[in-house]
Amino acid sequence: MEEERIYTIPLRDVTNKSPTTKRAPRAIRAIRAFLMKHMKSDVVKLDNSINEKVWERSLNKIPAKVRVKAVKEGDVVKATLIE
């Protein structure tokens, strides 16, 4: 059974609580943790487009939020960026 959802994931907490040199890696971990919690799965695969969006303006200037489409197939969640 396939389950598909669209989320707007806020990254403002990552910006406020992280030093500038660690924001992008922590944002990727925050996206993965958000999807694990909301899709109830331990395996989350992020598309390269999400990574490119977070790293687009370098390490320390991450976006405030990211819109993501998550599809759950069995135990695996695959996430792609929505423009």
Curated annotation (Swiss-Prot):
GO biological process, one term: cytoplasmic translation
GO molecular function: structural constituent of ribosome
Entries under InterPro entries matching the protein: Ribosomal_eL31 (IPR000054), Ribosomal_eL31_CS (IPR020052), Ribosomal_eL31_dom_sf (IPR023621)
Pfam families on file: Ribosomal_L31e
Keywords from the UniProt entry: Ribonucleoprotein, Ribosomal protein
Record carries keyword Amino-acid biosynthesis: no
Example of a GO cellular component annotation carried by this entry: cytosolic large ribosomal subunit
PANTHER family referenced in this protein's UniProt entry, alphabetically: 60S RIBOSOMAL PROTEIN L31
Family of the protein in this entry: Belongs to the eukaryotic ribosomal protein eL31 family.
Protein name: Large ribosomal subunit protein eL31
Gene that this polypeptide is encoded by: rpl31e
